[in-house]
Amino acid sequence: MSDMGGLKNLVANTDYLKAQSLDEKEIKKRRCSLGLPHLGNCTDVRVSVSKGFEDICEQQPIGRACFRQFLSVSSPEYLAAAELLDELNCWNLAEAEAKEEARLNIINKFCKADSKSFLAFLTEDEAEKCKAVSEKDFEEVMMGQVKEATQKFLRGQPFEEYQTSLFFDRFVQWKKFEKQPITDKYFYEFRTLGKGGFGEVCGVQVKTTGQMYACKKLDKKRLKKKSGEKMALLEKKILEMVNSLFIVNLAYAFDTKTHLCLVMTLMSGGDLKYHIFHVGEVGIEMERIIHYTAQITSGILHLHSMDIVYRDMKPENVLLDCQGQCRLSDLGLAVELPNGKTTTQKAGTKGYMAPEILKQEPYRTSVDWWALGCSIYEMVAGRVPFRDHKEKVAKEELLRRTLEDEVKFEHRNFDAPSKDIISLFLKRNIEDRLGSNDDPRKHEFFKSINFPRLEAGLIPPPWEPKANVVYAKDTGDIREFSDVKGVKFDANDEKFFKEFSTGVVPIAWQQEMIDSGLFDELSDPNRKESAAGLEDEEQQKSKSCTLL
């Protein structure tokens, strides 16, 4: 008898992997009917769009691109200002010889009075300091006074002129296009990657860009039955707030008749728990552990900078992308605690919860550092500090161990730096715990990590997933849900669904448009305009690519 479950899994994996290799001809076909809305239809957006410089010229990718295009054709002075900021950023991130080369290039290009790119907009005092800059005071002068003067200059007349230019018109058209309604027809859907308490996660692909994402589908009836609406909305709100290389990004939020859908960064390399127990020997190599922990630390610090406590730090919630870089995921238990606020709510996963959570004492961000200590320990030893892998422990005993037992470092792969950082993260006194009052990035464990370069995405990972491997459980191993019966929706439910389904998330969506080439294509003034919108059903790919 043939193994139909194995065949279904093979076909699902094949379609999923095939979709990640873009077919340029197919993409072109899907884009044929796309076009930016005419300016006459963008009046509402022009009135409502933000007029803040940081928002539309720095934070929004398409806004930044349009402003840069304006600067490049307006005047040499405007272009020089933009190029200086770019090159200062490159200098700041460069290392060794490349850093010195970048410094000399900046001096020759921008700091000499006879240079075509000399910064003529500087005041007399600023210009004199710029011309006299040396290796000794380069950072102080160029990254301080000159950089600030350049940013101030761009916020002035160049920004005013930009807002009356054709380039700003183009930005407004994109902001209108950004407001298109999003439904499940915007995507192709692929295999199920996993399931949680309220639904499943599957792979999806945007039809017009080919971009792959993970779609978290929350069952509406299950949410209502388990009173999970507030938690789902909070997770969505937090995902919209964060913008970090080390946290999954939310790109779209929409609903279907049966599900609320969060479309996020696809992390096709699997989670760290999978790598600990199912890839090679139990545990992870120390070089990888250091790299992942550095990225996790940066992600946690990003959350904490916005007064967000993660509360579910564990290897299972740390996902790898196709290049081997990691991000935090599943922010369903995260909580916002502004203005020094604390909570005593019990939340987290057994084996990773800090003493203050278990004792239901007031806490804030300290609990995430405890959980990170447990996670580093597990990456090394294949178990958490106070519970063996798959050991069944009564909650009273686990509480006793967490509050009383000393951490033992018996595994051969523990070294002095890993023992020390774990011990500091697992201090039971919050004030003594690493991360509570100091920066964990300064610990010796991270001596090989250049954090500015890491946070700019410039450090290659020590391990890269294989392109032909699906790092997820077989579809047959993913548990099924029982039916939810007797749940009916009312007006309040419909209001909640509408509040949840806000369509695209601007920064992530704009970056997708740029990365896929669609921004350049639709912004081309020589391109024949057509009605903006999605493909007709007849234009969609005829062959089936949905297999769940």
Swiss-Prot record:
One Gene Ontology cellular component annotation held by this UniProt entry: cytoplasm
- The active-site annotation reads D312
Instruction: Please give the residue positions where the record annotates the modification Cysteine methyl ester.
Output: C545
Q: Which residues form the Protein kinase domain?
A: 187-446
Report the principal subcellular site. Answer: membrane
Q: Which reaction does it catalyse?
A: L-threonyl-[rhodopsin] + ATP = O-phospho-L-threonyl-[rhodopsin] + ADP + H(+); L-seryl-[rhodopsin] + ATP = O-phospho-L-seryl-[rhodopsin] + ADP + H(+)
Q: What kind of membrane protein is this, topologically?
A: Lipid-anchor
The organism's place on the tree of life at top rank: Eukaryota
Q: Map out region (Disordered) in residue numbers.
A: 520-548
Give residues where Phosphoserine occurs. Answer: S33
Q: Which InterPro entries match?
A: AGC-kinase_C, GPCR_kinase, Kinase-like_dom_sf, Prot_kinase_dom, Protein_kinase_ATP_BS, RGS, RGS_sf, RGS_subdomain_2
| One MF annotation (Gene Ontology) recorded for this entry | ATP binding
Where in the cell is the protein located?
Answer: Membrane
Could you tell me the keywords of this UniProt record? Answer: ATP-binding, Kinase, Lipoprotein, Membrane, Methylation, Nucleotide-binding, Phosphoprotein, Prenylation, Sensory transduction, Serine/threonine-protein kinase, Transferase, Vision
Indicate which residues the UniProt annotation says bind ATP. Answer: L193, G194, K195, G196, G197, F198, G199, E200, V201, K216
UniProt domain AGC-kinase C-terminal: residue ranges: 447-512
Sites of S-geranylgeranyl cysteine lipid linkage?
Answer: C545
Q: In which tissues is it expressed?
A: Expressed in the eyes (at protein level). Expressed in the eyes, the pineal gland and in the brain.
Family matches, as PROSITE patterns: AGC_KINASE_CTER (PS51285), PROTEIN_KINASE_ATP (PS00107), PROTEIN_KINASE_DOM (PS50011), PROTEIN_KINASE_ST (PS00108), RGS (PS50132)
Q: Which residues form the RGS domain?
A: 53-172
GO-annotated biological processes = regulation of signal transduction; signal transduction; visual perception
**Which residues are propeptide?**
546-548
What is the E.C. number?
Answer: 2.7.11.14
Q: What does this protein do?
A: Retina-specific kinase involved in the shutoff of the photoresponse and adaptation to changing light conditions via cone opsin phosphorylation, including rhodopsin (RHO).
* Entry similarity comment: Belongs to the protein kinase superfamily. AGC Ser/Thr protein kinase family. GPRK subfamily.
* Name of this protein: Rhodopsin kinase grk7-b
Q: What is the scientific name of the source organism?
A: Danio rerio (Zebrafish)
